[in-house]
A protein has these predicted regions:
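Domain-level signal for soluble alpha/beta catalytic cores
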Residues: 1-196
């Protein structure tokens, strides 16, 4: 008897992929070489999930170094940051073990994603034999890009939020159009807010 399951969240990144991210940040490898390491990790994640008999699988989010910043930058360290962003934004998570995560800071508009989840779905579809699930970031997380104090010159908070909602919708619709069976919205900041 099988138990219906589906993946939630990312899988740990293999050591080889972690090294590739670090080497890419340091300029030691090209984007193409990083993509090769991501492809290998995604294929491994998909095949292992399929081997468990899971009726739906994911790529383990191996193509991203952070659930919160995949639309904005190539790596967690900020390599390949999108237009109108600076790397010195607010911290959104301080974990119990002391490590933290920082978002970029919006410097102007219009706000646009650099990368959409559909790109990950399209690549994973070529590797999977089972239906795919794709995670996307919640707009509430990316709303934290706008500085808490003051306004971005020439780009109101209201216009940013409108652009953000449009981009989030485009992200979700694009993932479905690319063939994903399910889209989940990653709302990790909600869990972190409950720790108080």
């Amino acid at each position: 008897m099988s138990i219906p399951t589906e993946p939630v969240g990312s899988l740990p990144r293999p050591a080889k992929l972690q090294a590739a991210y670090a080497d890419y940040d340091a300029g030691k490898i090209t984007k193409e070489q990083l993509t090769q390491a991501q492809d290998a990790a995604c294929l491994d994640s998909i095949k292992r999930m399929e081997a468990t008999g899971s009726p739906i699988v994911s790529d383990g989010e191996q193509r991203i170094s952070s659930f919160a910043t995949y639309p904005l930058t190539d790596t967690l360290a900020g390599t390949g940051l999108a237009d109108h962003l600076a790397g010195d934004g607010q911290y959104f998570a301080i974990f119990t073990d002391g490590h933290n995560r920082q978002l970029p800071r919006l410097t102007g508009g219009p706000f646009r994603y650099k990368t959409y989840a559909a790109e990950f779905t399209e690549k994973a579809m070529k590797m999977a034999t089972k239906p795919l699930k794709q995670a996307v970031i919640a707009p509430s997380m990316l709303a934290l890009l706008y500085p808490l104090d003051g306004e971005v010159k020439g780009y109101s908070r209201e216009q940013f939020l409108s652009d953000l909602c449009d981009e989030c919708e485009k992200d979700i619709r694009g993932a479905f159009k690319a063939g994903t069976a399910r889209v989940s919205i990653d709302f990790t900041e909600g869990r972190l807010a409950c720790r108080c």
